[in-house]
């Protein structure tokens, strides 16, 4: 068992209140910026996904909130 190593997962990054970062252009760099600023390897705009059009991050650290089932409370 390794200590001091954080695990990561691929997921929708969440704003406060369980809302996704909305996006509208699959080729924009917006989501990659949001994801990498939060420690992910990369990110992109997932169109028509489970929670609509939202930023999907690759290898997002476990300490960063992700979109979970339930309502987005704006």
UniProtKB/Swiss-Prot annotation:
Propeptide position ranges: 74
Gene Ontology biological process terms from the UniProt entry: defense response
GO cellular component, one term: extracellular region
Gene3D superfamilies reported for this sequence: Knottin, scorpion toxin-like (3.30.30.10)
Bilayer-crossing regions: none
Intrachain S-S bonds: 19-72, 23-45, 31-55, 35-57
Keyword Chloroplast: no
Keyword entries, A-Z: Disulfide bond, Ion channel impairing toxin, Neurotoxin, Secreted, Signal, Toxin, Voltage-gated sodium channel impairing toxin
Subcellular location: Secreted
InterPro entries per the UniProt record, alphabetical: LCN-type_CS_alpha_beta_dom (IPR044062), Scorpion_toxin-like (IPR003614), Scorpion_toxin-like_sf (IPR036574), Scorpion_toxinL (IPR018218), Scorpion_toxinL/defensin (IPR002061)
Tissue and organ distribution: Expressed by the venom gland.
Organism domain of life: Eukaryota
Matching CDD domains: neurotoxins_LC_scorpion
MF terms in GO: sodium channel inhibitor activity; toxin activity
Summary of the function given for this chain in its UniProt record: Alpha toxins bind voltage-independently at site-3 of sodium channels (Nav) and inhibit the inactivation of the activated channels, thereby blocking neuronal transmission.
Domain writeup: Has the structural arrangement of an alpha-helix connected to antiparallel beta-sheets by disulfide bonds (CS-alpha/beta).
Similarity comment: Belongs to the long (4 C-C) scorpion toxin superfamily. Sodium channel inhibitor family. Alpha subfamily.
Name of this protein: Sodium channel neurotoxin MeuNaTxalpha-11
């Amino acid at each position: 068992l390794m200590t001091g190593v954080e695990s990561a997962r691929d997921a929708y990054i969440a704003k406060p209140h369980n809302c996704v970062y909305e996006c509208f252009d699959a080729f924009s760099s917006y989501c990659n910026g949001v994801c990498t600023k939060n420690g992910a390897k990369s990110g992109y705009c997932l169109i028509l996904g489970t929670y609509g059009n939202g930023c999907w991050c690759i290898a997002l650290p476990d300490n960063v909130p992700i979109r979970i089932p339930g309502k987005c409370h704006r």
